[in-house]
């Protein structure tokens, strides 16, 4: 894909139940509102999406209850990648709907990165011996480099499989890195983080992306700039301090895009509020995007939602109410971006 900025995408998760009908509905809606690179609707938790199928083929990895995982011993990396059905869904859907395929520039897949996956796996007693507790109250796999490295190898093969499907943007979502890297790094070295991320991304030959939530420290920014990632994807609406962290030269000197979160995804209920009360107006979004253009340059920007919308399912009593908020936010984001092209 040539260097062309100011295209639109989204992070992935949507606030509706994980059904085939909802997958079809959400993907179609993303295309029809004008998202340039729609992501497959991520309708299950980002960690169990990969850890659950892995627990069925990695014997020491157990899912003791839904979304709770324990590792008890060393393990062999599986021979075949797991969780490919989401990419296959997009490929098959667009084959069946060529009219919709003609309306988009490409597709996006959201995968979960090795550090974040490892942070969600608890260690059994044998593996946790001698490890000091930091950040977490329990021993977790992220504290052991060899486990993180194995997860990177696993995600590399999943990324390669998605790349081979022809998916254009493939993101390794790594929200835990915002906690891991502040003024200093917990558990690992800078070189290990760069090497591990590059390994996880190495199967992706199109547009590898990394999504990290929250405030980005200058140290984390500099680490990510040294990786092979092409798109650095961060929250700006919720964490406006990130405007002070990134400069245009960071992107141009390192040949990166900045995916700028433009609509807020972390919401609190307001008494008596309707759907539109939660949705940013087009004029507001035009001004917000213009701020990014002035700072970073139109050709260096990707416009997207702050994070995924999946958490809204718990924020509001009605799934349909939450879903309409998400879709209307994205629609206004697209309209604002098109007016600034």
Protein language model features and the residues they cover:
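Domain-level signal for soluble alpha/beta catalytic cores
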Residues: 1-341
């Amino acid at each position: 894909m040539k260097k062309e900025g100011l295209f639109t995408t989204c992070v992935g998760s949507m606030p509706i139940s994980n059904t085939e009908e909802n997958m079809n509905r959400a993907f179609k809606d993303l295309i029809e509102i004008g998202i340039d690179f729609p992501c497959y609707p991520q309708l299950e938790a980002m960690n169990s999406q990969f850890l659950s199928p892995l627990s069925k083929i990695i014997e020491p990895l157990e899912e003791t209850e839904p979304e709770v995982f324990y590792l008890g011993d060393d393990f062999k990396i599986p021979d075949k990648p797991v969780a490919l059905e989401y990419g296959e869904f997009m490929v098959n859907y667009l084959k069946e709907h060529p009219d919709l395929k003609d309306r988009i520039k490409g597709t996006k897949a959201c995968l979960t990165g090795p550090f974040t996956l490892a942070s969600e796996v608890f260690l059994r007693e044998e593996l946790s011996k001698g490890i000091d507790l930091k950040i977490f109250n329990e021993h977790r796999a992220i504290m052991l480099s060899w486990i993180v490295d194995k997860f990177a190898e696993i995600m590399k093969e999943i990324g390669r499989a998605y790349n081979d499907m022809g998916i254009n943007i493939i993101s390794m979502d790594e929200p835990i890195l915002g906690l891991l890297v502040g003024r200093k790094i917990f558990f690992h070295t800078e070189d290990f983080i760069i090497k591990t991320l590059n390994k996880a991304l190495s199967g992706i030959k199109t547009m590898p992306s990394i999504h990290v939530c929250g405030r980005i420290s200058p140290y984390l920014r500099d680490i990510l700039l040294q990786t092979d990632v092409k798109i650095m994807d961060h929250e700006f609406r919720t964490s406006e301090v990130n405007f002070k962290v990134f400069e245009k030269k960071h992107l141009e000197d390192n040949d990166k895009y900045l995916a700028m979160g433009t609509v807020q995804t972390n919401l609190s209920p307001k008494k008596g509020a309707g759907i539109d009360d939660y949705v940013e107006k087009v004029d507001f979004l035009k001004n917000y995007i213009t701020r990014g253009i002035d700072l970073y340059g139109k050709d260096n920007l990707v416009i997207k939602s702050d994070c995924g919308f999946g958490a809204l399912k718990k924020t509001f009593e009605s799934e349909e109410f939450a879903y309409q908020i998400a879709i209307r936010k994205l629609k206004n984001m697209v309209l604002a971006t098109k007016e600034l092209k």
